[in-house]
Amino acid sequence: MADINSAFWASHLVEPKRSYKYKVDWGDGRTPWYLFSAVDLPKYTLGETPVHALNHTFKYPGRITWDDITMEITDSESIDAAGVLIEKLLQAGYAYPTSPNVYRTISKQGCIAAMGILRITEMTWDERIIGQWTLKNAWIKSFDSGKRSYDSDDAVKISLTVTYDWAEYSANPEGSRPTMG
């Protein structure tokens, strides 16, 4: 019979990751991490390729598609997150159609450069980094500047959908931590 003290719940080394212990950074130096009030972690879908033989269907793995993520940013009077995001759109190549001589267009290269390197960092209770997602070639696919209402005193939330080519995960990038034996 196993010793009760060796069970995972009896160990002081076991601590679940907490959903609220994270930071988001896209490298612009202007948007502080605390404005990112919610973010989806990366996820993928592995496609399948069926092969038919007589009365049977055999499935083989196909292509991986990394699914878009959504982010929620709390807009701020002092930082103006909506203004930062519109500026990113302009940096991506968008130009307001104010004259017939506007020829600029948005490019993937411009979108990626405007977005910066998007990282989602997971932390412990004492702010040690325990995991980090880096979204490769990320760019903002959709922007919703929020809602205003006289019936509410809630903070204004900006919703973003971010698309990317793939994500890389680095487990415990700050060094080793104790593990259960």
Label the predicted regions.
Residues 1-181:
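Glycine-rich, low-complexity intrinsically disordered segments
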